[in-house]
Amino acid sequence: MTIEYEWRGTFQSDELNRLHAEAFETPDEWDWRAQVAGHSLGWVVARDAGALVGFVNVVWDGRVHAWIQDTMVAMDARGRGIGTQLVARATDAACGAGCEWLHVDFDDGLRDFYLAACGFQPTAAGLKQLTQPR
């Protein structure tokens, strides 16, 4: 099937919660509509025959910096380039909105995906945990 991608595409929180639980192995349920309305420049949805198979969120500072957040692809849809296309379309949209920098942080297992497949450059950055792990 042909994957359809849409910037600021429609989604239901329950379908995105299922995808998030599968991608990140977390049972958390969020109100994704409220989340993106309050913090996002936009997002990209990927659908295969109407089913949500991918999502990426682009949060921003309202000016020149944007961040890739929550790139997710359904397990049975992986290996088809969907994640790369999600990030590419998010990159184009952030650039079109006037952003000058697109940031991403990731677990080591995603290093090749973000650096080699998506074209990000490694940087020195810092991170401070503000809560105790669950």
Q: Where are the regions a protein language model picked out?
A:
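Conserved beta-strand-loop-alpha-helix junction that forms the acyl-donor binding cleft
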Residues: H103-D112, L127-R134
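A conserved beta-strand-loop-helix scaffold within acyl/acetyltransferase catalytic domains
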Residues: D31-A49, V53-M72
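Short amphipathic alpha-helix that is part of the acyltransferase structural core
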Residues: M1-D31, V45, G126, R134
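Conserved acetyl-CoA pyrophosphate-binding loop and the N-cap/start of the following alpha-helix
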Residues: A77, G81-R89
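Conserved GNAT acetyl-CoA-binding A-motif
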Residues: A94-F106
